[in-house]
Amino acid sequence: MKLAVIGGDGIGPEVTAEALKVLNAVRDDIETTDYDLGARRYLKNGELLTDEDLASLREHDAILLGAIGAPGSVPPGILERGLLLKMRFALDHHVNLRPSKLYDGVESPLRNPGKIDFVVVREGTEGAYTGNGGAIRVGTAHEIANETSVNTRYGAERVIRYAFELAQSRRKKLTLVHKTNVLVHGGGLWQRTVDEVAKEYPEVAVDYNHIDAATIYLITDPSRFDVIVTDNLFGDILTDEAGAVSGGIGLAASGNIDATGTNPSMFEPVHGSAPDIAGQGIADPTAAILSAAMLLRHLGDEDNAVRIETAIAADVAGRDNSQPISTTEVGDRIVKALQS
């Protein structure tokens, strides 16, 4: 397995090291290439992501990312647009996959959360984040600005098919989230596509929620969901809420996936670079390790993905949450569990 590793900034390299430790405990064929991408490189020479970087990344089977960001040193938006979004579009990461699971031993902010175990499939390369917009008369009382949400049948269908395949392998329920009563053109495209693709998956139950209703149900009845499929903007909102109800983003992993396999997909923890605790050895690497499990599953290694997830579930359930986290100790415990 040829693995591109982007440790990134802050705690990113620390948690990524533990994810690699766990990967090497279950596989002996991993060949890694480290990439200096993120705030450190940008502050040093102004580079974000070059064509040479992209060409080199494409030579790998997958990408493991730690975290990107340097609040206070790099203005907001520069790394997001110039590195993360550029990589997403260049490598056609059209599926953003975000599992949400409440583990035993983890406290949800919800009083009676029930069983939380669902996945959000978010479209990643269209919608309101394509940069299709503009502004005139900026800074005046007559300023006009617009952002156009771009939706194509091709883009929506490939994500919807991915979601149906996922639902078929899980509890066989798919929920489309949109705002079709107001966004009649883009929403209509998504609804029609779901209705048509659903005919090929008769065993999958399909329902629909408006985005406002879905945000409520994630709080009041999260166990109703199995697989949620939605567009880029609504998915951005739902995935962060999903992380919150399942105990916080410290346990949230994600995948940015080219479902065709043409380009390497990227897997990362959802949390940020947390520069305030970087270098102290107290960052929780669990989300990074879960990202590594997602990476293995994407590459067809289901057995080892399940082994890692099982070890994590047992470790999380047995933690003394009154004691501080040790980054390396968490990785060591997971490795020990895998080797026992």
From Swiss-Prot:
Single Gene Ontology MF annotation: NAD binding
Keyword presence, Amino-acid biosynthesis: yes
TM regions (residue ranges): none
Pathway stated in the Swiss-Prot or TrEMBL entry: Amino-acid biosynthesis; L-leucine biosynthesis; L-leucine from 3-methyl-2-oxobutanoate: step 3/4
Domain of life: Bacteria
Binding, NAD(+): G272, S273, A274, P275, D276, I277, A278, G279, Q280, G281, I282, A283, D284
Binding, substrate: R88, R98, R122, D212
EC top class named in words: oxidoreductase
Site (Important for catalysis): Y129, K179
Gene Ontology biological process terms from the UniProt entry: L-leucine biosynthetic process
Subunit structure: Homodimer.
Function field: Catalyzes the oxidation of 3-carboxy-2-hydroxy-4-methylpentanoate (3-isopropylmalate) to 3-carboxy-4-methyl-2-oxopentanoate. The product decarboxylates to 4-methyl-2 oxopentanoate.
Protein's recorded name: 3-isopropylmalate dehydrogenase
Source organism (scientific name): Corynebacterium glutamicum (strain R)
